[in-house]
Design a protein with these regions (language model features):
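Conserved short alpha-helical segments that host acidic/polar catalytic motifs at enzyme active sites
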Residues: 1-226
């Protein structure tokens, strides 16, 4: 399966992201990843965690990270988060879920517009890359997320980190939870609220199926109704 977590804070959030992602480690066994938005762009790190715990893999990486917004992911398959440069601007993205019609979506994208996909080991296509390609067909990030939600057969929960804030979108069937937490000067979205108490956040609410929220350090705003 997997888990995701993201932060929008007035203060440096690297340690919250580090521990918050680690607290999701029981949801996946293969890969972990973190991405921080810094003044000079995105700083991303991904490691295989099959044979070593998350913390030992990333404790050196976080020394080179500094920023107030970031996302993390634990995965049983796809390496993520990914960084994307598109007509909607640059962003980082992480997902959780299952896409049952992946081949159909790939063929549709290749037919309708210039597209290319990086092949992973084993010949598959990264689910998160595919979702990003769908988002890029939209007028903006919210419209792109709606397109992805409509096209995917199965379920996909999405975090998109932009320079303006964090988009958090729950899958359309509500199969994978996405929960909003809050502390003074910061908001976060996570697959599990278990992490909140350990990093000083309090439960605020759970997104409804297909709901899209936009988080900044000052607010949690619904920008796509459930």
């Amino acid at each position: 399966m997997g888990g995701v977590i993201g932060f929008a804070s007035k203060q440096d959030c690297v340690m919250d992201l580090f521990f918050g992602t680690d607290y999701h480690s029981h949801l996946g066994t293969k890969r972990g990843g973190m991405c921080i938005l810094q003044e000079d762009g995105f700083n991303r790190s991904i490691h295989n965690i099959e044979n070593s715990p998350f913390r030992s893999k990333f404790e050196q990486d976080i020394e080179e990270m500094k920023g107030n917004m970031g996302i993390g992911a634990i995965s049983d398959g796809d390496p993520q988060p990914l960084t994307v440069y598109s007509r909607q601007g640059d962003y980082a993205i992480a997902t959780v879920g299952r896409i049952n019609n992946k081949d159909e979506i790939v063929q549709e994208l290749l037919k309708d517009r210039p597209s290319q996909f990086m092949s992973m080991s084993g010949g598959g296509i990264n689910n998160t890359e595919l979702v990003a390609a769908l988002i890029s067909t939209g007028r903006d990030i919210v419209d792109g997320i709606r397109i992805a939600q409509a096209k995917v057969e199965g379920s996909v929960t999405i975090l998109v980190l932009t320079r303006e804030g964090l988009y958090a979108a729950r899958d359309k069937y509500g199969r994978t939870p996405l929960i909003i937490g809050h502390k003074d000067g910061a908001y976060c979205a996570a697959s599990e609220s278990f992490a909140f108490i350990n990093i000083g956040y309090k439960y605020k609410r759970e997104l409804g199926p297909a709901e899209i929220a936009f988080l900044t350090p000052d607010e949690d705003k619904t920008v796509g109704e459930p």
